[in-house]
Amino acid sequence: MGTFTLHQGQSNLIKSFFRNYYLNAELGLPNDMELREFALQPFGSDTYIRHLSFSSSEELRDYLVNRNLPLHLFYSSARYQLPGARDMEEKAWMGSDLLFDIDADHICKLRSIRFCPVCGNAITSEKCERDNVETLEYVEMTSECIKRGLEEARNLVEILEDDFGLKPKVYFSGNRGFHVQVDCYGDCALLDSDERKEIAEYVMGVGVPSYPGGGENAPGWVGRKNRGINGVTIDGQVTIDVKRLIRIPNSLHGKSGLIVKEVTNLDDFEFNEALSPFTGYTIFLPYISIETEVLSRNIKLNRGVPIKIESSIGIYLHLKNLGEVKAYVR
């Protein structure tokens, strides 16, 4: 049984789903895309292709569909004079957007299981000695955890708008959290890493004192502290990095098959199948027996027993390592 291999990018069926999506996808590209570095992780590879440059959406689409189909797709938060240069100094940095990353799994304690895809047994090590294969890990993302991440995004937006006068945009990351982005020009774009660190620490509540009185409706941190908000849980390194890569809006996340989607109304966001572009049904073959929450639905899988299920769910389960999509059923 040692011949078993698995890679998220090995399935030709999954590749066909992604390729068909990118044939017509309207990617959310910046209006200065010719100044941005593009990067991607292609199917069948663990490494990124970087230092790409495109001048139009048509040129980018042709590259993605006909040359390197992406499992993950990015552009740089930075603008460069020569974005395609391989040397970072040669690129000549011109400024960057301001980014914040909220990972729901940093907020919640999530259920995870490591298992052998051949025998289906739960195994704590990275290899199943009996079947001589690498084990896989599944982490259950719940709707409740996503809701908590959304609340963090809501608090962050309030701080950026009220305390800094900025106009942030919120994006569902396509997997387990939210990205908050401020399109920066002028002085904002030229903030260095130290200045961005100060902003990150401010929104995290680092060094912000408690203020007596004022009530919950008081402005700024006075009101927030009285509402029990002591800071926003973000990945500070993302904000500090002036050359960070951003997932392209309306691209697909290769660990879920869900769309990286702008959330224009935080009250309307739901973690469900509508985040997937895939329609129809698939035949899914589970590696293990498990009951789990998937896109706000409870799903029961039995090891080795094929199940007909919506493509949105089947592709999600496949990319989460729980089994394989074996066929597409219209």
Swiss-Prot record:
It holds the Pfam family DNA_primase_S. SUPFAM superfamilies: Prim-pol domain. GO terms for molecular function: DNA-directed RNA polymerase activity; metal ion binding. Belongs to the eukaryotic-type primase small subunit family. Heterodimer of a small subunit (PriS) and a large subunit (PriL). This is DNA primase small subunit PriS. The lineage of its organism: Archaea, Thermoproteota, Thermoprotei, Sulfolobales, Sulfolobaceae. Keywords: DNA replication, DNA-directed RNA polymerase, Magnesium, Manganese, Metal-binding, Nucleotidyltransferase, Primosome, Transcription, Transferase, Zinc. Its cofactor is Mg(2+); Mn(2+). One of its GO terms (biological process) is DNA replication, synthesis of primer. NCBIfam families: PRK00419.1-3. Zn(2+) binds at C116, C119, C128, D131. Catalytic subunit of DNA primase, an RNA polymerase that catalyzes the synthesis of short RNA molecules used as primers for DNA polymerase during DNA replication. The small subunit contains the primase catalytic core and has DNA synthesis activity on its own. Binding to the large subunit stabilizes and modulates the activity, increasing the rate of DNA synthesis while decreasing the length of the DNA fragments, and conferring RNA synthesis capability. The DNA polymerase activity may enable DNA primase to also catalyze primer extension after primer synthesis. May also play a role in DNA repair. GO terms for cellular component: DNA-directed RNA polymerase complex; primosome complex. It is an enzyme of class 2 (transferase). The active site is at D101, D103, D235. Its EC number is 2.7.7.-.
